C-alpha cells in the first residue's frame, strides 16, 4: 500500500531584514509545494514548521504549520506567531478514493526518468 500520511518537519523562515512581500511569496511557495505532495501521492500531508525567532534575532521562522487531505485541501492552518498543538482527524479511507478516482502518479512514464541520472543527456 505504501505511506498513509506524509510528515514534513521543517524549520524554515526568513531573515528579519527581508521585505514582507518576499516573505509572503516564499511562504506561499513552500505551502504550495507541500500541498502538491498530497496531490501527487493521494495521501494527507502534515507540514510542521518552527515558529518564533532564532536566538540572535536574525531569523524569524514562518510557523504556519498545516494539514491537508489527499487532494491538498487545507484542513488546518496554524498561527504564524505562536506555538500551537492541534489534533486533526484524518480519514485514511479517503486516500483510496483519491488514488482510484484521480490516479495522479499512475500515468507517469518512468521509462523516461533515466536521463535525469546523468550530468549530460547525450553522455554515453
Regions found by a protein language model. Give the residues of each.
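CN hydrolase (nitrilase-like) catalytic-core segments centered on the catalytic cysteine
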Residues: 1-85
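Generic detector of leucine side chains in alpha-helical contexts
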Residues: 6, 74-77, 90-92, 105, ...
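A structural signal for well-ordered alpha-helical scaffolds and beta->alpha junctions
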Residues: 27-31, 91, 117
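A short, polar/charged loop-to-alpha-helix boundary motif
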Residues: 82-99
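Cysteine/selenocysteine-centered motifs that mediate thiol-based redox chemistry or coordinate metal-sulfur cofactors
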Residues: 95-124
Amino acid at each position: 500500500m505504501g505511506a498513509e500520511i506524509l510528515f514534513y518537519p521543517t524549520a524554515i523562515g526568513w531573515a528579519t531584514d527581508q521585505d514582507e512581500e518576499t516573505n509572503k511569496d516564499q511562504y506561499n511557495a513552500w505551502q504550495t509545494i507541500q500541498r502538491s505532495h498530497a496531490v501527487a501521492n493521494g495521501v494527507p500531508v502534515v507540514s510542521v514548521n518552527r515558529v518564533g525567532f532564532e536566538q540572535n534575532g536574525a531569523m524569524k521562522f514562518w510557523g504556519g504549520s498545516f494539514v491537508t487531505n489527499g487532494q491538498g485541501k487545507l484542513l488546518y492552518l496554524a498561527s504564524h506567531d505562536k506555538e500551537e498543538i492541534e489534533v486533526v482527524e484524518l480519514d485514511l479511507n479517503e486516500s483510496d478514493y483519491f488514488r482510484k478516482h484521480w490516479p495522479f502518479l499512475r500515468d507517469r512514464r518512468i521509462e523516461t526518468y533515466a536521463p535525469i541520472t546523468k550530468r549530460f543527456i547525450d553522455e554515453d
